[in-house]
Amino acid sequence: MRLAIVALCGALAMGAADPPPVSKTHVPAPAQRLLPRFPDFGYLPAPGAFTPDRTFRLSQDFPADLPAVEPVVQRILAIDFTHDWRAYANAVLAYIMEGNIEDRGVSQAFYLEDNKVRRWYHVPWQHWGPNGREGLHGLTQEVTSRSFYLGPRQKTPAETWAVGFYNARGGWLIGRVWADADNPDPGAVRRAGGFPVGTVVAKLLFTTASPDEVDYLTNPVQWSAFVYPAPGAKPTGARKPTDGVIVPVRLVQVDMAVRDDRAKATGGWVFGTYVYNGALNHHSPWLNLVPLGLMWGNDPDVRSQHQATPGSQPYNPDLKETVINRADPMLPFSHLGYGLRLSGPVDNNLSSCKSCHMTAQYPEISPILPTMAVTDLGKKPVCGDATWMRWFRNLGPTDSFDPQGQTMDSSLQLAASIQNFVASRNESTGGLYASQFWKNRAMPIAGLRGDVPEDGDPCRPVG
């Protein structure tokens, strides 16, 4: 196109005949934007320091109209997740992988623009801030796995970096919230009734941990990522776009969530987690994933904890809204969450998949974990008390965690996108917005998974 324009300009300069007039019935194609509405990433090595094969592109052409539920998703929604949980988990994982891993090397997988089967979409405004998207695969920093958190031989702290995406039905609601790139609409989530049934969300979680210390990471799915220079090293001030180092990161966990109306009584979502185990040695390493379990509710009345039987995967028989994979010898041992609710290897063992995501709202009035909370009396909640159990309620898609907040229907990414946008505006305008405050306090996103308190686990398992 550029050569054609140059040639045309040259011909006109040399006195060539004027081009024929445009027909009145011809409508010229709309001009292509040089830049998309939202930045793709925040951090990439300086030019000359590293030349990547390709860079991450944010999938942001959100559907204007709500897409129909795909037939394959209809089949997933027909599987009884309470009784045939493994079939449900396997079907969702196959749906996530289809079109994203075939006929390409590991490093070229999950560039969503390459998927010829279906469209997936990213949440914008994950590029901003010190934990923002790196430019090779779109990974954002989540949590530090302290020594021995991932396994008994893990001596070196490791960082978790992740990228998440939504299918077309989920992308439709993201597009409604971000219809105006300069003024997001948090209320769009509640007005839509939350994410539509048939929304599927996936997140790939990578760790800087080595197979030498975490044996199930052998035969890895390995990417290069532009991350912090050392495990546990986090910038204390502003981070420059070229700050970081290129290191190998390895797939450790895949999370999924399905908006399934059969779970309406407990919140409308089914969450699942898969753990990587390279010993499976499938023809594609992306298939070396073992389902850890599903959860569709928080079991709000269950405060019990049960110790694991030596050599077996722990579980709590009191839980009725969680199912844990207890019989698969290929499942790496996992610590699980509070009261042995579903929680993956890099997740917090004082929470659960559903509990974390249930806090998604704007602004973030309450923190993501009960261990981060402070009561009105200035005290921390006690494990299992009434304040603690606020994080283990069953809230619906239009219910916000705090009455003063606006629900993001379990999307921490969507909540963070608005927080990041407004915080960025604070810097550019030198001002603040009332919507950021509650009880005269600014409430920033505190970290998508949250570290275990340094003073230890307040919920000691009992017999």
Language model segments and positions:
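Bacterial N-terminal signal peptides
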Residues: R2-A13
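Conserved small-residue
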Residues: D18-S352, A360-G463
